[in-house]
């Protein structure tokens, strides 16, 4: 049972509480373990809530729900070979904007979940590994030291995705070089996130072949889209959870969305996707969860043709259920206590 606004679910007939009550809150004890070599992990029984992933989407989200609490973190993107999108606004050819510093300035007492594009094509990863882009890494380091808040950095996100064409050896070399330089530069507010596509991998390489090593990885992450239209996220995702457990790393859902859409007057997205999203976070003791509040039709060049508009503001009932679930103390949101809860001392 879930205590919701208006009393306990099912009592007094609160339809929103009834939706929230569908979430399975049991925790698999196998996924409760001590973490080693990590940073900025929420306390036991807590999970960091993050929303993304463009300036436009984040602005729309906050404008759509002005009276709801802000999440504990915001998701943003940038990419080698440039620091554009960190301290300035970078706009892509499709009109989406990124600016990490703007998120810092607009939302005190929140963290950043930052995705670093570093692919195999055009020798991006290879060049990074051989020092061509050291100035970019140093530029990131200099900027990171100015913001005094946690950054969860996904280096070469979805490293095993066929769309990124990353050879494991080139990826590992580039990833390690990035981390080594940030450490040399005295950066202490960045947690390094190793983020799997959680789907059939590039060239069938083994997951472990992309692993830079325990001393280089603070968190392990997955993307979960269509995976969550059922109670089990699938063999590839499960392998990542098992890998994180074997290496004693906390887990993050770094990207997630009910990609088939959220529609007005239709609770299908809640019942078939959101229930599984939250339930998996409980079951696997996932320490950070990200939600992408996006209209995927705007990403037509990037995503499968069946991906739809999956923004919470499309359905008032689904949005209310989202905010009732995430209102629980379990979810770390924007607050003056957040950094302390994450073990971060500015």
Model-inferred region functions:
Residues 1-18:
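Ser/Thr-rich, Pro/Gly/Ala-heavy low-complexity intrinsically disordered linkers and tails
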Residues 19, 24, 28-57, 151, ...:
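Substrate-binding cleft of secreted/luminal carbohydrate-active enzymes
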Residues 90-111, 215, 219-262:
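Glycoside hydrolase catalytic-domain groove-lining segments
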Residues 61-70, 94-113, 139-149, 209-215, ...:
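Acidic (Asp/Glu)-rich catalytic clusters
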Residues 77-200, 307-314, 326, 334-345:
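Substrate-binding cleft of extracellular glycoside hydrolase catalytic domains
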Residues 179-205, 250-262, 290-294:
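Aromatic-lined carbohydrate-recognition surfaces of secreted/lumenal glycan-active proteins
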Residues 69-81, 114, 207-232, 254, ...:
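Aromatic- and acid-rich polysaccharide-binding/catalytic face
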């Amino acid at each position: 049972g879930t205590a919701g606004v208006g009393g306990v679910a099912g009592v007094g007939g609160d339809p929103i509480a009834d939706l929230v009550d569908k979430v399975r809150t049991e925790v698999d004890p196998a996924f409760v373990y001590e973490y080693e070599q990590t940073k900025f992990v929420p306390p036991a029984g807590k999970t960091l809530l993050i929303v993304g992933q463009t300036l436009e989407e984040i602005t729309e989200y906050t404008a759509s729900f002005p009276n709801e609490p802000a999440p504990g973190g915001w998701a943003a993107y940038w990419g080698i070979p440039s620091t554009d999108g960190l301290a300035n606004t970078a706009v892509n050819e499709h009109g989406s904007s990124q600016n990490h510093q703007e998120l810092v300035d607009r939302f005190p007492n929140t963290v950043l979940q930052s995705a670093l594009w570093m692919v195999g094509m055009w020798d991006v990863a290879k060049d990074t590994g051989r020092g061509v882009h050291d100035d970019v890494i140093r530029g990131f380091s200099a900027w990171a030291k100015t913001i005094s808040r946690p950054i969860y950095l996904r280096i070469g996100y979805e490293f095993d995705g066929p769309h990124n064409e990353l050879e494991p050896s080139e990826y590992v070399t580039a990833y390690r070089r990035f981390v080594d330089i940030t450490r040399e530069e005295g950066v202490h507010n960045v947690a390094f996130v190793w983020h799997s596509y959680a789907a059939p991998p590039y060239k069938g390489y083994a997951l472990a072949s992309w692993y830079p090593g325990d001393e280089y990885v603070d968190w392990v992450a997955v993307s979960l889209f269509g995976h969550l239209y059922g109670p089990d996220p699938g063999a590839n995702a499960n392998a990542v959870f098992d890998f994180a457990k074997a290496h004693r790393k906390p887990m993050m859902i770094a990207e997630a969305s009910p990609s088939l859409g959220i529609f007005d007057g239709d609770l299908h997205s809640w019942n078939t996707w959101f229930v599984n999203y939250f339930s998996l976070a409980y079951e696997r003791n996932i320490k950070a969860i990200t939600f992408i509040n996006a209209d995927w039709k705007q990403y037509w060049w990037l995503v499968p043709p069946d991906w739809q508009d999956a923004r919470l503001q499309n359905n008032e009932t689904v949005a209310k259920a989202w905010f009732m679930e995430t209102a629980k103390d379990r979810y770390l949101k924007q607050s003056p206590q957040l950094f302390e809860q994450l073990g971060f001392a500015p």
